Amino acid sequence: MNNIILNNGVEMPQLGFGTYLIPEDKFESAICEAYDLGYRQFDTAWRYHNEVALVKALKNHNVKREDVFITTKVNADALYKHPYYYGWRMIQNIPYRTIENAIEESLDNLKWGDYVDLFLVHFPWPMFMKMYKALDKFYKQGRIRAIGVSSFLPPHIEALKEVSDIVPAVNQFEISPLNTQKELIKYCQDKGIAVEAMSTFSHFRSLEPRQEIIENDIIKSIAEKYRKSTVQIVLRWLYQQNIIL
């Protein structure tokens, strides 16, 4: 398994296993099977509500903590103890301590050893700078090995300089053959920020494959030429760009 060396020297497996929308009754078996197939990077988040289940599954499978890389994310949803509806209220003025509490909750959920490998700001919410500042604090305490962002554009990343001297280790965002994101990829790589692809084969909040990619005539013709599946061709395209999958 190839590793990507992040800008602080931490090694991150290039191939990861996403845990979003895995049914609860199939979750543990899916995690164990993924591990047996060779996956060593697992991606979760507070809003997936499976952080505890992820650690439990890996422990039950007799996996050693040092043998896996775990990513989680802090999301605006975590700042409320009641259902959160997007656009329901202005959220710029969330207290900083509330954000710290949300991060602490994820750290407790993933308490296995004394660290989380990678912690991302899940989206550039109005309070994203407070979120990153809080992650900076936990990173410097040694409780997080690397911090980063998700779905951030250059202006968001540049703004982080106001609250932290830590350049994000990773920016996770949608990349696909129909949304190549060449400019954003170049920006991140020029800044030493590793790029991680998400939503390459499925739309947000859906497990259904994107037929416009799977059945794309150009991708299919390349797949036929090399006797591979369209999925394999797309994964190879990402892999050769040094993108985390």
Language-model region placement:
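Short loop/turn motifs at secondary-structure junctions
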Residues: E11, G38-Q41, K64, K111-Y115, ...
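Conserved, mostly hydrophobic/aromatic
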Residues: F17, A34, F42, L54, ...
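Short, acidic/polar
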Residues: I22-Y35, Q92-K111, K130, P155-E158, ...
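A short, structured active-site edge motif that brings together acidic residues
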Residues: E66-Y80, L118-H122, S151
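Acidic (Asp/Glu)-rich catalytic clusters
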Residues: L6-N7, E33-Y35, V55-F69, S106-D114, ...
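Surface-exposed, active-site-proximal loop segments in enzymatic domains
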Residues: L79-N93
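N-terminal binding-site loop/beta-alpha segment at the start of enzyme catalytic domains
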Residues: M1-V68, T72, A78, F201-R205
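Beta/alpha (TIM)-barrel catalytic core signal, keyed to glycine-rich beta->alpha loops juxtaposed to Asp/Glu
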Residues: L107, F123-L245
